[in-house]
Structure formats: structure tokens, C-alpha cells
């Protein structure tokens, strides 16, 4: 796959430039499987956290000096790590590593789903939203499996197809894709569905513990409840019924449908 760049009396064919990051760290199995899956589609620059940064969403480092460390380099592939957040990694890569504007930003493959309200907490989606805010075609991939040795091989044909399509056709301005995969055997996949985010809530989120030295401390945990389990148009329903869930996600979070109901707020 090549991109044509036109100049006076000159046509230059260039491979697409793909920027990849995650929130599980550059050594995670998911991101390394992703690199292999999309390697043939362009030149790859990876800039990912030096360790796990799950739950960082769109956070960036305003008061911490950031570092970049080259971990691996070969023809068409560079892998960098940073002490920053997932969004820091994208900002750093766009400023310091990419020779031109990438044709695609990919977040993932995440160890664990990023469906429903998890979208708002996800560092993987932070990567994708940052790309989207820079008007770069951006996609996030996540598997409903938190294990470090998760099997990502069933995802390959779907990821390859989605990446090819986005590179060829692009996405609407201000829209990125949040793609979640169910934890099932490859033969059990039933297809792909376009979905909306399910409404869900987290409860029992804090576990209080007592330290032997006399003070209390807390672990963030929690239990997720799908508030609309029967709605077949949601990502949770699709995942629970063996479908790959694709949720088009907007950079613009304005609730346009609420304008009429809230007109009385105008002065």
C-alpha cells in the first residue's frame, strides 16, 4: 500500500505512516501482536508508556519532565518508550518522532474491554481521541481479556480488514472507532456490529484496608453493571452475543439532542 504525493512534474509513492500506542506499556503482548498484524500496511512508529498506565484516559503530564527511549529500530519500524501517559506518547511522537503527519493512529490492542462507560477511563481510547483531535484517522482495539498472555490471534483478520479500510477510505472528520472483541473461540465469532455505547455503572469501587502501622488505605476495584442488557444496539449486547463491537466515537461530545429541553438556560 502506497500513498501518492503530487509535486510539480513529480509523483512520489510513500508507504502510509502508522503511529501506535497503548496504555499497557510497550512490552505488553497486545501491542506487539498488533505491530505484527499491521506491519505490512506501512511504516510503523510505536511510542508507548514504559509501564502500565491503565485508566489514564486523556490525561497528560503538565508538571513532569518527559523522556523518550529508543527500544528497537529496523527498516520501517521504530519502537520508543516514554515515562509519560498514553496521550503524552502521542503528543511526543507527533512532535519529535514522526517525519510527517501519520495516516493512522492506533491504540491497543488493549488487555481488557473498553466498552460502555469504560471508554471514558481508557488510556487506549485516550490515544485514539488524541489522534482524532489532531484530525488523524484513529482506531482503538481492545479484547475482553485482562490476562497478560491473552490470545490475540482470533482478532487478526478483523483488525487487518478494519485497518485496510480506514487507510483506503478514511473516517468522518472528528470521528474515531472504538473496536472491542469478545473473549470467545475464533470459530464462535458471529460477525461485526456497529453499536452505540451501553449505559452502565460501576459500584463498590473502593476497597478499604487497614495497614499494620495503623493507617487506612484503599484499592480501586468495583463491579460493572450493564443498565440496559436487552438493548441489541449496544456494545455490551454485541460482545455478550459473540460479535465484534464497533462504536463510532465523536471528538465533539456536545449533547445536541438536549438543546430544546434546556433552552430556558439561555438568557
Which functions belong to the PLM regions below?
Residues 2-13:
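Short, Lys/Arg-enriched N-terminal segments with co-localized hydrophobic residues
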Residues 15-18, 29-96, 100-101:
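A cross-family phosphate/adenosyl-ligand binding-site feature
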Residues 20-27, 118:
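Short, glycine-rich nucleotide/cofactor-binding loops
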Residues 24-33, 221:
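Short acidic, Gly/Ser-rich segments with clustered Asp/Glu that frequently serve as metal-coordination loops
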Residues 113-122:
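Glycine/threonine-rich flexible loop motifs
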Residues 127-131:
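Hydrophobic/aromatic ligand-binding patch that stacks against planar heteroaromatic rings
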Residues 132-154:
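Glycine-rich phosphate/pyrophosphate-binding loops
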Residues 153-267:
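Electrostatically charged, flexible surface regions
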